[in-house]
Amino acid sequence: MEIISTQKFILLTLATVAFLTPHGACLDELMKSSLESREDDDDKYYETKDSILEEKQRSLNFEEMKDWGSKNFMKVNTPTVNKVPNSVANLPLRFGRSNPEERSIKPSAYLPLRFGRAFGESLSRRAPNLSNRSGRSPLARSSIQSLLNLSQRFGKSVPISLSQGVQESEPGM
């Protein structure tokens, strides 16, 4: 390979610059002209679109809009709902019951209300089933006595038969 002299190198560089500069200027002009033409086209497009929209907006009348509203919408009536009384609404129909009226609203004997009226009734039903031996034992006597105290504390008097049963078991110890 030959070493290129500086004179030849400078000459080659100037020729390349001279050759590429006009083409670059042409490309710039072409680029500018295409961009400017696009901007002009865009402006024209938006101007025509705006003018069409303005014409459409000017041509609308309120009467036409009222006509459109009445034609396009259908009025739908809401279905009527059968109202169920409150006492029946919460009763499920299952376990072989056909009518909700079969279920009583009163609490059952084995499910007393919390601190309520069925507390003393459930005690009176269970107390006669105690044998005499259980009445004599101190454990049974203390449990019955605590039940009596509970019922009195919450404002419910225990039936007389239960209190008499406890009193009878005390003297015979």
From Swiss-Prot:
Keyword Phosphoprotein: no
Signal sequence coordinates: 1-26
Record propeptide residues: 27-82, 98-103, 118-140, 157-173
GO cellular component: extracellular region
Modified residues (Phenylalanine amide): F95, F115, F154
InterPro entries found in the cross-reference section: FMRFamide-related/fGRP (IPR026297)
Keywords: Amidation, Neuropeptide, Secreted, Signal
Any one GO molecular-function label of the UniProt entry: signaling receptor binding
A single GO BP: negative regulation of gonadotropin secretion
Tissue: Specifically expressed in the diencephalon.
Keyword Protein transport: no
Broad class of where this protein is predominantly found: secreted
Location in or out of the cell: Secreted
PANTHER family attached to this UniProt entry: PRO-FMRFAMIDE-RELATED NEUROPEPTIDE VF (PTHR14403:SF6), RFAMIDE PEPTIDE GONADOTROPIN INHIBITORY HORMONE (PTHR14403)
Its job: Hypothalamic factor, responsible for the negative regulation of gonadotropin secretion.
Family membership noted in the UniProt record: Belongs to the FARP (FMRFamide related peptide) family.
Listed name of the protein: Gonadotropin inhibitory hormone peptides
Species name: Coturnix japonica
Lineage: Eukaryota, Metazoa, Chordata, Craniata, Vertebrata
Gene coding for it: GNIH
